[in-house]
Amino acid sequence: MGELYLVGGGLSDVRDLTLRALEVLASVELVLVDTYTSVYDVSEGDLKRLLNGFGGDPEVRMCSRRDLEERFFDLCEGYDRVALLSPGDPMAATTHVALVVEAADRGWDVEIINGVSVFTAAPSKSGLEMYRFGRTATIPLNVRSVYPYDVLESNRQAGLHTLFLLEVAEDGEFVSVADAARYLLEIEREEGRGVLDPSDLAIAVVRLGFEDELVAWGTLEELSDWEPGEPPQALILPASRLREAEREYIRRVLPHIRDVRGV
């Protein structure tokens, strides 16, 4: 068939693209931009101008979830070199894993260009030890599920931190840090397993990689009544016991939510 590149766009916008990613994007005939797996500040015109500066002139198309899940290979017809640009790291989305498998079955040569992802950047900004993070869970929008609570319980039993990703819909509706805190507290009240308490420490990760990025801490109860702004947002619940270095980082480096905007 041809060559397909899955390119990680990084956390917020085209400034997060690596030099290698830019060279690849400038070399292809068609760039399909994933607009639904996370918030990514890019326009067709801005991307084309950037790639023109690297000697490229690809066609650029912004793609919805339906485009990627149902029409991706139809969109690739007639092109020998195609890139899919997605927020974060391209293989963090299960949709893209399935896409790579199908591409290989169809005879495409696939190359993955990694990018900075929330999976590493959020733990890094929190000051918590990365190897102490357990499974990640997503807190969904308008869906009731005990699964995130189960993941937290499993991680805490193993002495591990938990990263919660907060869903953002294509129409812009999203789960906020406050929504997530209330969600977990309500499930605890219903389940009564003693997995968490309103006084538990939590870390809000807001607009990671954007100019208005904010990483701050508070109790779950405090966060449940705190709206820090626009997506993307994430929530970290540390393990029940912190290492001394982790505790000092939070205390000395991260602000409490009462000391930052909107509080």
Swiss-Prot record:
Catalytic activity: 2-[(3S)-amino-3-carboxypropyl]-L-histidyl-[translation elongation factor 2] + 3 S-adenosyl-L-methionine = diphthine-[translation elongation factor 2] + 3 S-adenosyl-L-homocysteine + 3 H(+)
Keyword Methyltransferase annotated: yes
CDD domains: DHP5_DphB
Superkingdom in the source lineage: Archaea
Pathway the protein takes part in: Protein modification; peptidyl-diphthamide biosynthesis
Single GO biological process annotation from the record: protein histidyl modification to diphthamide
Keyword Transferase belongs to the record: yes
Function: S-adenosyl-L-methionine-dependent methyltransferase that catalyzes the trimethylation of the amino group of the modified target histidine residue in translation elongation factor 2 (EF-2), to form an intermediate called diphthine. The three successive methylation reactions represent the second step of diphthamide biosynthesis.
Family listed: Belongs to the diphthine synthase family.
Subunit composition and interactions: Homodimer.
The protein's name in its UniProt record: Diphthine synthase
Gene encoding the protein: dphB
